[in-house]
């Protein structure tokens, strides 16, 4: 009997209302234009990185293999939330179906968790390349790289299935307003008709622990790298420092959000939306900028690719 009641309660809410970004009508045009530009540039920048890495054989190395994965993830991660947000800018009632909300949460956490694992793998790749250069091609051979890629995508999928499963099993029978511009687990579970304290602890121990542990591993990895480079100022070492600085910047931007949102109970703070905007719209745009501006090989390969296209057009 209790299960039947719970099923009926769960089926009462078929749509959620997204509160979105609270702005007046005059600001909507500016906000829409800004995020549309961000999204288009994110697509162009990251797709261009993937094409360049595929096209230029000099970039067929483990580091750029993982970088192409990062660019692909950034495109997908941004696409999960930004197009819906752009449509909702002009909608007075921002609705999302229960199924669409669950789907959005699944892919959001799939790409986010996969990126966390990927950034950790990239830190290990840089550690081996800089601290053990003679063993690099043995340790980071292509078989290992492919296995690592499969492992991090599998880990992201398992994590996302676990969180989504916890969310959809809860009964939703009344409140339907999500205080955000997309569906995310912390905001959705607050709408459940039962006490979610245990679920919140599980989320913190899952997402929060993954974020904190990976961040610590990353910081330790780069600390070891910096210690090994501190007394060497050759051109190759300066290049290595530049690459590590780019990686560390991306790590700080991305994991900072994850730790802020998922390492505490599901309480709304005024800063949550600002952090979420930065996480979903700004960080995927900054990644290609950071990697290309600080990477001479990428800039050279991009110039070569653009130059060849221009010559073809002239012919």
UniProtKB/Swiss-Prot annotation:
It is a multi-pass membrane protein. Belongs to the G-protein coupled receptor 1 family. This is Olfactory receptor 4E1. The lineage of its organism: Eukaryota, Metazoa, Chordata, Craniata, Vertebrata. SUPFAM superfamilies: Family A G protein-coupled receptor-like. Glycans are attached at residue 8. Residues 1-33, 83-101, 165-208, 262-272 are extracellular. The chain crosses the membrane at residues 34-54, 62-82, 102-122, 144-164, 209-229, 241-261, 273-293. It comes from Homo sapiens (Human).
């Amino acid at each position: 009997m209790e299960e039947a009641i719970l099923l009926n309660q769960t089926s009462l809410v078929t749509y959620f209302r997204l509160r979105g970004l609270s702005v007046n009508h005059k600001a909507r045009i500016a906000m829409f234009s800004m995020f549309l530009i961000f999204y288009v540039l994110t697509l162009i920048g990251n797709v261009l990185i993937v094409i360049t890495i595929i096209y230029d054989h000099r970039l067929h190395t483990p580091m750029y293999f993982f970088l192409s994965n990062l660019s692909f993830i950034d495109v997908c991660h941004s696409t999960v939330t930004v197009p819906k947000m752009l449509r909702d800018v002009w909608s007075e009632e921002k609705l999302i179906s229960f199924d669409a909300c669950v789907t959005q949460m699944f892919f959001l956490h799939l790409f986010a968790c996969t990126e966390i694992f990927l950034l950790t793998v990239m830190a290990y790749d840089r550690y081996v390349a800089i601290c053990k250069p003679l063993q690099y091609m043995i340790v980071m051979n292509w078989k290992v790289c492919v296995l690592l890629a499969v492992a991090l995508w599998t880990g992201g999928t398992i994590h996302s299935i676990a969180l989504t499963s916890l969310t959809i099993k809860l009964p939703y029978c009344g409140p339907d307003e999500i205080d955000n511009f997309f569906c995310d687990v912390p905001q959705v579970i607050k709408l459940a008709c039962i006490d979610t304290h245990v679920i919140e602890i599980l989320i913190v121990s899952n997402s929060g622990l993954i974020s904190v542990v990976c961040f610590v591993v990353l910081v330790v990895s780069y600390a070891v790298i910096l210690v090994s480079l501190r007394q060497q100022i050759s051109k190759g070492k300066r290049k290595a420092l530049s690459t590590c600085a780019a990686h560390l910047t991306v790590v700080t931007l991305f994991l900072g959000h994850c730790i802020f949102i998922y390492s505490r109970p599901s309480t709304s703070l005024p800063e949550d939306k600002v952090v979420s905007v930065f996480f979903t719209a700004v960080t995927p745009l900054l990644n290609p900028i950071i990697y290309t501006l600080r990477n001479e090989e990428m800039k050279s390969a991009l110039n070569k690719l653009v130059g060849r296209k221009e010559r073809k057009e002239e012919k």
